[in-house]
Amino acid sequence: MEALVYTFLLVSTLGIIFFAIFFREPPKVPTKNTK
């Protein structure tokens, strides 16, 4: 049971960090490079 909780915490933390970086950096690059 504890392993599941720790895994969930790890995944959620990684997801938050990934989303923070993803939404913070590429709003300028893909806007200029539109096909």
Curated annotation (Swiss-Prot):
Gene Ontology annotations of biological process type: photosynthesis
Membrane-spanning residues: 3-23
Disulfide bond residue pairs: none
Main location: plastid
Entry GO terms, CC: chloroplast thylakoid membrane; photosystem II reaction center
Topology with respect to the bilayer: Single-pass membrane protein
InterPro entries in alphabetical order: PSII_PsbT, PSII_PsbT_sf
Subcellular localization, as worded in the UniProt entry: Plastid, Chloroplast thylakoid membrane
Keywords carried by this UniProt record: Chloroplast, Membrane, Photosynthesis, Photosystem II, Plastid, Thylakoid, Transmembrane, Transmembrane helix
A UniProt-annotated Pfam family: PsbT
Function of the molecule: Found at the monomer-monomer interface of the photosystem II (PS II) dimer, plays a role in assembly and dimerization of PSII. PSII is a light-driven water plastoquinone oxidoreductase, using light energy to abstract electrons from H(2)O, generating a proton gradient subsequently used for ATP formation.
PANTHER family attached to this UniProt entry: PHOTOSYSTEM II REACTION CENTER PROTEIN T, PTHR36411
Subunit structure: PSII is composed of 1 copy each of membrane proteins PsbA, PsbB, PsbC, PsbD, PsbE, PsbF, PsbH, PsbI, PsbJ, PsbK, PsbL, PsbM, PsbT, PsbY, PsbZ, Psb30/Ycf12, at least 3 peripheral proteins of the oxygen-evolving complex and a large number of cofactors. It forms dimeric complexes.
Family in the record: Belongs to the PsbT family.
Protein's name in the database: Photosystem II reaction center protein T
Protein source organism: Pisum sativum
